[in-house]
Design a protein with these regions (language model features):
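Loop-helix junctions at membrane interfaces
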Residues: 1-169
Length: 169
């Protein structure tokens, strides 16, 4: 006997949203511009928290880095950064999730600042032990202020997307 299991409309919508947000997060790095890529990926993380919940957002925050490493699109010197990138995305997601009900911007700024502080601390202290000085310096710059800027731009982009979606309803 064959048993057919049907998905509800809400389950189908959630799967479609997850797939769409994941696809955007995976393809954004192909733009090869940290400001654009980081802003898009962070916007996806904020949107995922709001539309799918924090567990799905954490998965979306982890998968692009892992896929980039496996597919060869991530430069080899950045592969040791993957755990730090995934952790910083989880920090952004957790802080935003915890504070978003108080106020969207309180959650967005808290998540952005904590993500930046984590990556800044990691780059300032640890990277000199992993890479030669020249490579460590360039990676430290990438993990510095651009992380805060792209997280805040991502929050703004997500907010504008939400406003646009609500105006279409």
């Amino acid at each position: 006997m064959i048993r057919i299991i049907a998905l509800s409309k809400n389950q189908i919508i959630s799967i479609a949203q997850f797939g769409t947000l994941l696809a955007i997060a995976i393809f954004a790095p192909l733009l090869h511009n940290q400001l654009i890529t980081g802003s898009i990926v962070n916007a996806v993380l904020f949107l995922a928290v709001l539309t799918l919940g924090w567990p799905s957002a954490v998965a979306i925050g982890a998968l692009p880095s892992l896929i980039a490493a496996v597919s060869g699109t991530l430069p080899a010197p950045l592969i040791p950064m993957i755990p730090f990138i995934i952790t910083s995305n989880a920090i952004l997601i957790a802080a935003f999730y915890l504070f978003k009900n108080k106020n969207y911007w309180v959650g967005a700024v808290a998540g952005s600042v904590l993500k930046f502080l984590f990556l800044y601390s990691a780059s300032a202290g640890l990277f000199n032990f992993i890479w030669p000085q020249k490579i460590a310096a360039s990676i430290a710059v990438m993990m510095n202020w651009p992380q805060l800027i792209t997280a805040l731009l991502g929050a703004t982009l997500a907010y504008l997307c939400l406003k646009m979606i609500k105006s279409l309803d």
